[in-house]
């Protein structure tokens, strides 16, 4: 399994478990490896929204849509 996949899996698991700060850390590390992935930007946005950081979440959703305008999950 690649480092990127491990980071994403850890992020998703922590997000589902309510460990939002840890999830955010994993998604941010994954974005360092693949900054052009709209799904990662969306996951980061979901995590930030869960933390109540709505403005930052909105920016992540916008970035996701810039990368893939067809991504309805970000809209």
Question: How would you label these PLM feature ranges?
Answer:
Residues 29-32, 62-66:
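Conserved structural position within tetratricopeptide repeats
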Residues 5, 39, 73-74:
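Start-of-helix register in tetratricopeptide repeats
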């Amino acid at each position: 399994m690649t480092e990127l996949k491990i980071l994403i899996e850890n992020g998703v698991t922590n997000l589902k478990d309510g460990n939002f700060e840890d999830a955010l850390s994993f998604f941010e590390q994954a974005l360092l490896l693949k900054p052009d992935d709209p799904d990662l930007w969306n996951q980061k946005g979901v995590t930030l929204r869960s933390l109540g950081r709505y403005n930052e979440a909105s920016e992540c959703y916008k970035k996701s849509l810039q990368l893939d305008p067809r991504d309805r999950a970000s809209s």
